[in-house]
Amino acid sequence: MAMVVSSWRDPQDDVAGGNPGGPNPAAQAARGGGGGAGEQQQQAGSGAPHTPQTPGQPGAPATPGTAGDKGQGPPGSGQSQQHIECVVCGDKSSGKHYGQFTCEGCKSFFKRSVRRNLTYTCRANRNCPIDQHHRNQCQYCRLKKCLKVGMRREAVQRGRMPPTQPNPGQYALTNGDPLNGHCYLSGYISLLLRAEPYPTSRYGSQCMQPNNIMGIENICELAARLLFSAVEWARNIPFFPDLQITDQVSLLRLTWSELFVLNAAQCSMPLHVAPLLAAAGLHASPMSADRVVAFMDHIRIFQEQVEKLKALHVDSAEYSCLKAIVLFTSDACGLSDAAHIESLQEKSQCALEEYVRSQYPNQPSRFGKLLLRLPSLRTVSSSVIEQLFFVRLVGKTPIETLIRDMLLSGSSFNWPYMSIQCS
């Protein structure tokens, strides 16, 4: 049986129904068309292909509309006998929704989940079967599959806004400005940005005032939030949650200190020597002069890396791409599929290059300068970061152990160590 979606209309329906402005209701019911008119209504201006009409017949088809809720079938779907399945559950597709051919059920489920920002939990092993008969049994795995097959969150968020109209405040820089007027964001970068759990306001005004000397308690709290936020961000970006848990742990255990430096630069974390030494407890325990000097050298290296990033005026989209490039490294030990991880790093790098060339056409060397900052992040010793920011919080517990606990617990902000207060 031929599949006809609501965005295509047989001209003879208009003639038979005496309704040149719309389809014949009886004929539409006989076809069993897709979603309701409110969901499937098309708007002019997107320029997507449509089924041509026979010359001289009334009832020209509606032009495709926003990227969100198209309901658009494949070309010629009204005349072919092709049956297109929902890429999520295998049921009969009603058209193209949020970038993929899906049924009405999966389309509505995805839209509801994204618009309401719903969070689901899998009671099994996060690998439940999703088909016509089991799609309602696990919402977590159903949403996971929607994202895996390529349904786009950003298409839902745009709703029916015209393509040229920006969504005010949708993506904000650390200074609170919307991406300096940049209207271009690839779908991948959009998802990276939406995974960011730490807007500047979360850390208060102190974090944004480099000349303000923070107290030890504030330093401990801010550092903990930056670390926890890095893990939370990784858990919500594309592709990372689909990796084996052992691979997730390996990647974060290797790269956590680099992500921490990037987050510190992004929020303009004050790095004054005196409170950092106090936070590290150097005044409480005897230390040789040589060791103190060496420790201060490490602090200087940390400060330099942060300042060099700040000097480039890196925006939020660039920070997200840089963190993804750092995270998806095949250098981690014991990866089950290093080639796949490397391909994700290449995808992140290509997304950054495309974004930079589109948004900064007058800075041809900007992409190279950003990439050149990444190798030097490893010059900041992870053990020094632990001593500076976390020894008062968790004692001798290795950061790698904490990261593993955060991943396994499923929530960084409800992590048990957060109950420990800096003293």
Curated annotation (Swiss-Prot):
The keyword Zinc-finger applies. The keyword Metal-binding applies. Its main location: nucleus. Gene3D superfamilies: Erythroid Transcription Factor GATA-1, subunit A, Retinoid X Receptor. Transmembrane segments: none annotated. A zinc finger (NR C4-type) spans 86-106, 122-146. It is linked to Bosch-Boonstra-Schaaf optic atrophy syndrome: An autosomal dominant disorder characterized by optic atrophy associated with developmental delay and intellectual disability. Most patients also have evidence of cerebral visual impairment. PANTHER family: NUCLEAR HORMONE RECEPTOR. Coup (chicken ovalbumin upstream promoter) transcription factor binds to the ovalbumin promoter and, in conjunction with another protein (S300-II) stimulates initiation of transcription. Binds to both direct repeats and palindromes of the 5'-AGGTCA-3' motif. Represses transcriptional activity of LHCG. This is COUP transcription factor 1. It comes from Homo sapiens.
